[in-house]
């Protein structure tokens, strides 16, 4: 109440002066806030400019370094001598053309050209060896080692089929038909023996093994 009374008793000039002082202090406070905000914006703008400037300088330096590296590589380029193609490779000591022959993958596996071609006389000798290996699967049948029976049959039958076709193609026309009939019968019995091994049937395997041996003997007798 005393303060209010003092205000009432104060002169208009005093009140006007106090209002001017208070108003100026408020204006000064708001001005400081604006200046602080502007300074923050200026600092952030300067930081972004510095970052972009550094990135541009880095890209230019990388481009110059890459260009100098390429020039150095081109300057030090050495010619490479290319020699002749390698010699034919294979499993035999004299080397074979087996790995260098074209393969017709559209054909069935048993007809596909993937074995080393031999003259008829050498093909006949290899056919006899393949026939012996097929006959030697009997102990595997007795032990019921069916996967091994199938592996040996398929491996040796592939060689035998290829060599018999070579021999038949070299025979006169009147001998070709009889040999073709015998080979067809032979491979039918081999397929039956393979199927018996797949079914793990000892009785069927014994039956078709005997038929295979008989057919092999007939074919070998024709070969001489």
Swiss-Prot record:
InterPro entries the record matches? PsbQ-like_dom_sf, PSII_PsbQ, PSII_PsbQ_pln
Instruction: Write down the superkingdom of origin.
Output: Eukaryota
Give residue numbers for the modification (Phosphotyrosine). Answer: 209
Q: In which tissues is it expressed?
A: Expressed in green tissue, with high steady-state mRNA levels in leaves. Not expressed in roots.
Listed GO cellular component terms?
A: chloroplast; chloroplast stroma; chloroplast thylakoid; chloroplast thylakoid membrane; cytosol; extrinsic component of membrane; photosystem II oxygen evolving complex; thylakoid
Record-level Gene Ontology MF annotations: calcium ion binding; mRNA binding
Q: What induces it?
A: By light.
Similarity comment: Belongs to the PsbQ family.
Q: Which PANTHER family match?
A: OXYGEN-EVOLVING ENHANCER PROTEIN 3-1, CHLOROPLASTIC (PTHR33399:SF3)
* Protein name, UniProt field: Oxygen-evolving enhancer protein 3-1, chloroplastic
In which organism is this protein found? Arabidopsis thaliana (Mouse-ear cress)
């Amino acid at each position: 109440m005393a303060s209010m009374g003092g205000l009432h008793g104060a002169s208009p000039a005093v009140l006007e002066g106090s209002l001017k002082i208070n108003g100026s202090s408020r204006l000064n406070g708001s001005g400081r806030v604006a200046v602080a905000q502007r300074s923050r914006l200026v600092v952030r703008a300067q930081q972004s400019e510095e970052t972009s400037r550094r990135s541009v300088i880095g890209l230019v330096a990388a481009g110059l370094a890459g260009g100098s590296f390429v020039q150095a590589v081109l300057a030090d380029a050495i010619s490479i001598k290319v020699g002749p193609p390698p010699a034919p490779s294979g499993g035999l000591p004299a080397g074979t053309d087996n790995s260098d022959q074209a393969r017709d993958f559209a054909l069935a596996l048993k007809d596909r050209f993937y074995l080393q071609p031999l003259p008829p006389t050498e093909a006949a000798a290899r056919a006899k060896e393949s026939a012996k290996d097929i006959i030697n699967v009997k102990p595997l049948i007795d032990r019921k080692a069916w996967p091994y029976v199938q592996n040996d049959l398929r491996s040796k039958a592939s060689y035998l089929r290829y060599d018999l076709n070579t021999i038949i193609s070299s025979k006169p026309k009147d001998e070709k038909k009889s040999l073709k009939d015998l080979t067809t019968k032979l491979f039918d019995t081999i397929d039956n023996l393979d199927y018996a091994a797949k079914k793990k049937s000892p009785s069927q395997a014994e039956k078709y093994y005997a038929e295979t041996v008989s057919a092999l003997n007939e074919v070998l007798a024709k070969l001489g």
